[in-house]
Amino acid sequence: MRIALWLASAFIAAAGAPAGAQVLTFDDARRLALDNQPALRALEHAARAAQLGSVADSTLPDPRLKLGALNFPVQGFPSAREDMTQLGLSWEQSIPGGDKRRLRSERANAEAGQLSAEAHSTMQSIQRDVGLAWVDAWSATAAERLAGELQREFENAVELARIPLASGKGSPAEVLAARQALSQAVDRRLELSQQSARARAALSRWVPEAAARSLPAELPQFEVPPPLDAVRKSLDAHPQHETQVLAQGVADADVALAREASKPDRTIEVGYYGRSGGRSDMVMFQIAFELPVYADRKQDRQVEAKLRLAERARDMRADHLRELQAGLEAAYEEWRLAGVRLENARTATVPAAQARLDALNAQHRAGGASLAAVLEARRGLVEGRMQELQLSGALARSRVALSYYTNEGAHR
């Protein structure tokens, strides 16, 4: 009778974090991961550096100031009558040919835009990855709690099985069956404890100071994603694809710069030279040009190389869009099937296991079913609830993964 009373007791899931404990919610984890993320700061620094470089690239090169002596005689100095020695000061300025300065500045701005888009894309990837890690940690922790409840119930079953045996009415086989069930429950709890520790370690990659906090008792309420066709059409605006688009812009800027390289740079020099002995001082002006006499082996080859890289950027952009589309299709189908499986577990698997346990409880009270059969049914019910729990986590995980493609918040 005592065994029947124990078996009829309601199964109560472990509550959430104790009162007053600091809880790490789904939103908290995603916010903390973005607040202190070295990868994002590195990209922001790189983008800012490129922006600053664009100003420098649009500016003329620094001029050169020359000081020196010219026509210094090696014999007869200083009594030579035709002394042409001059002490001179000159100013030299290089001027890049064509629109090189403007194009260099535009190229730096394009690179800054690409790095900013990469930072946005990385931010979205981090939100997805920390969300997945949080769901994994929640699922593992909840499963460990459930296994702990099963272990405690089987510990009680062992004690209750011993009571009839002490009065000579019980069966040693029932005690052994209870001990075997307890041993299996302990092993399952230890296995889930390992999984929970690994999940917490993975979460600490994103929130190292907060990964050890308690997690809520329930998963957040996730929204139904937009229709698949609508998400497909929005992939052109996906942050990661935008990075590829801007990378193509950088490659096109490199092509324009390579074409401009055939326009020679100029160097202008103006100088003043003084002579002694009452001789007239002199001024000097000269201009130098680069001569692209090897254009077929240098500038033309550089243009061809940059054109190839620009084609590569375009092909990578197209391939990346295909990759996004394939990932979206897979993520959407995974989310849909996870929902179907969860509904089946809730409406069929768990109710069937509960009905089987209730029937065996009734038979056991009437002396028609063994304790081992009841314990096996009890474990079957817990396994069903464990499956329901795992499928809840799988549905949440697939929804978080899908939010990476929908570019929207995954929950209210």
Whereabouts are the PLM-identified features?
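Terminal intrinsically disordered/low-complexity segments used for targeting and assembly
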Residues: M1-D35, L52, N71, S193-K233, ...
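Periplasmic alpha-helical coiled-coil/stalk elements that build and connect Gram-negative outer-membrane
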Residues: L24, T122-A237, A331-A338
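Amphipathic alpha-helical coiled-coil scaffold segments and their short linker/junction regions
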Residues: R30-N36, E174-V175, R179, E209-I268, ...
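A glycine-/polar-enriched beta->alpha junction
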Residues: R31-R41, R48-P63, P78-A80, L89-E106, ...
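Amphipathic alpha-helical coiled-coil segments
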Residues: A42-D57, T122, I126-A147, N156-V158, ...
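Transmembrane beta-barrel strands of outer-membrane/channel proteins
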Residues: L65-N71, I268-G274
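Residues that define the transmembrane beta-barrel architecture of outer-membrane proteins
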Residues: D83-L87, R279-V283
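Short, charged, amphipathic alpha-helical segments
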Residues: S105-N109, P172-A181, L371-R379
